[in-house]
């Protein structure tokens, strides 16, 4: 967030105050120009309840305006087991009473290897969720159910990253060709994987 001004490389009062000022300026701009728009702060701490709690306590103490919702990133490779996500959702929705989304997540649908994989199979694997189309669908269902169960009426939804990267020719993100191929929700010929269907059912 506009480094170095908004950097929290050190958790000091003045750093939280600086970041709060930046975020509040953004909130005011949205409220003034598009008052019907909803504002979400996106944190990458979906697997770290303690860090999430500390972030909010310090930011609200520094005068941060409450947003309309919070988005959390959750990837098993970096965030650990799903129970970590559950704990963090409880912090956001329970302790702070904020609507919450899993704003970024993914899980491989194949154990095949990529030239430059974003999700490392060895570090991403969760017990009970195979690297297969059905395993990916089970993961999507589980994440949706966890969000709904923990956050209840404060659950916003689940966003997948990256939905449309079906083959090496089309995957053009900066991490390299095919980096996200096996976390896609579509097949190489553009058909929906079971996980996309699962997410659709969960949203109803």
Predicted regions and their residues:
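Structural preference for beta-strand elements that scaffold enzyme active sites
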Residues: 36-40, 66-71, 99-102, 155-159
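Active-site beta-loop-alpha junctions enriched in small/polar residues
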Residues: 1, 42-47, 72-77, 105-108, ...
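Active-site cleft segment of glycoside hydrolase catalytic domains centered on the general acid/base Glu
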Residues: 1-61, 65, 79-91, 95, ...
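Short, surface-exposed loop/turn motifs that are enriched in glycine and acidic residues
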Residues: 74-79, 129-133
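Aromatic-lined glycan-binding groove of carbohydrate-active enzymes
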Residues: 64-69, 81-82, 88-117
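Aromatic-rich peripheral "rim/lid" segments of glycoside hydrolase catalytic domains that contact
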Residues: 4-14, 87, 91-94, 110-204
């Amino acid at each position: 967030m506009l480094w170095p001004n908004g950097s929290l490389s050190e958790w000091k009062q003045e750093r939280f105050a600086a970041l709060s000022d930046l975020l509040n300026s953004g909130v005011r701009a949205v409220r003034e120009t598009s008052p019907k728009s909803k504002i979400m702060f996106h944190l990458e701490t979906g697997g770290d309840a303690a860090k999430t709690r500390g972030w909010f306590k310090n930011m609200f103490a520094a005068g941060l305006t409450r947003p309309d919702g919070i988005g959390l990133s959750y990837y098993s490779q970096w965030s650990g087991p799903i129970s970590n996500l559950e704990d963090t959702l409880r912090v956001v929705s329970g302790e702070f009473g904020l609507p919450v989304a899993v704003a970024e997540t993914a899980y491989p649908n194949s154990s095949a290897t990529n030239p430059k994989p974003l999700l490392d199979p060895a570090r991403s694997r969760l017990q009970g969720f195979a690297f297969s189309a059905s395993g990916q669908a089970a993961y999507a269902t589980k994440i949706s159910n966890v969000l709904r169960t923990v956050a209840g009426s404060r659950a916003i939804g689940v966003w997948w990253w990256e939905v449309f990267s079906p083959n090496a020719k089309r995957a053009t993100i900066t991490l390299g060709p095919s980096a996200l191929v096996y976390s896609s929700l579509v097949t190489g010929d553009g058909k929906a994987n079971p996980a996309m269907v699962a997410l659709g059912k969960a949203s109803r």
